[in-house]
Curated annotation (Swiss-Prot):
Keywords: Cytoplasm, Hydrolase, Metal-binding, Zinc
UniProt: Zn(2+) binding residues: H68, H161, H165
The protein, known as: Putative metal-dependent hydrolase GK0616
Oligomeric and partner information: Homodimer.
An example Gene Ontology CC term for this record: cytoplasm
UniProt KW Hydrolase keyword: yes
Annotated localization: Cytoplasm
Cofactor-binding details, from the entry: Binds 1 zinc ion per subunit.
Function: Possible metal-dependent hydrolase.
Pfam families to which the protein is assigned, alphabetical: DinB_2 (PF12867)
Annotated disulfide bonds: none
Molecular functions (GO terms): hydrolase activity; zinc ion binding
Organism: Geobacillus kaustophilus (strain HTA426)
Length: 178
């Protein structure tokens, strides 16, 4: 079994749930609701030089991680909405590494993305809290993937995703003594 790089995956890799568990779903919703606050704590007090430091060699800068979380959250929110309102929609992936190179991800301060996350995650959590178990069993079909993804798995994935990137920033701060 391959060893997981603890700098790249400080909380481990994503493990997809095999079945719907209401208690777990509530934990995932809480993580999604809490991401903006947790991320603000992780980046609090960092100066421009620190924000422009890659979290690992060859990795994104802290600022790019923040902007990536805004990009990924927008995509995930829309995937959730499509999954709830359409029958098995095909959802397009986004070229994360290319998006991380765009001017808004490389030049813009992080505050606009943090503000976007505040509003978006409040709406996303409200949507998730309104969903029934049947809604969580609805699916989306990621373009190019084999099979469908139930919305409870999508929710778990993005709960993990936010914690994963926040932990990358926190880990960098700890390693650098910031």
């Amino acid at each position: 079994m391959a060893t997981v790089d603890p700098i790249r995956y400080p909380i481990g890799t994503f493990q997809a749930p095999q079945q719907f568990e209401a208690g777990e779903v509530q934990e995932w919703i809480a993580a999604i609701r809490g991401l903006p606050s947790d991320l603000r704590t992780a980046v609090s007090g960092l100066n421009d030089e620190q924000l422009n430091t890659p979290y690992r060699e060859g990795g994104w800068t802290v600022a790019q991680v923040v902007h990536h979380l805004a990009d990924a959250s927008m995509n995930a929110f829309l995937r959730t909405k499509w999954g709830v309102t359409e029958d098995g929609p095909t959802v397009k992936p986004f070229a994360e590494s290319e998006w991380a190179k765009t001017a808004d991800a490389c030049l813009l301060p992080i505050e606009p993305s943090l503000l976007l996350l505040d509003g978006l995650h409040a709406r996303w959590a409200a949507l998730l809290e309104s969903m029934t178990e049947a809604d969580f069993h609805r699916t989306v079909r990621p373009e190019g993937a084999a099979g469908e993804m139930p919305l409870y798995v999508l929710t778990a994935l993005y709960a993990w995703h936010g914690k994963h990137h926040t932990a990358q920033v926190a880990s960098l701060r700890k390693r650098k003594g910031w």
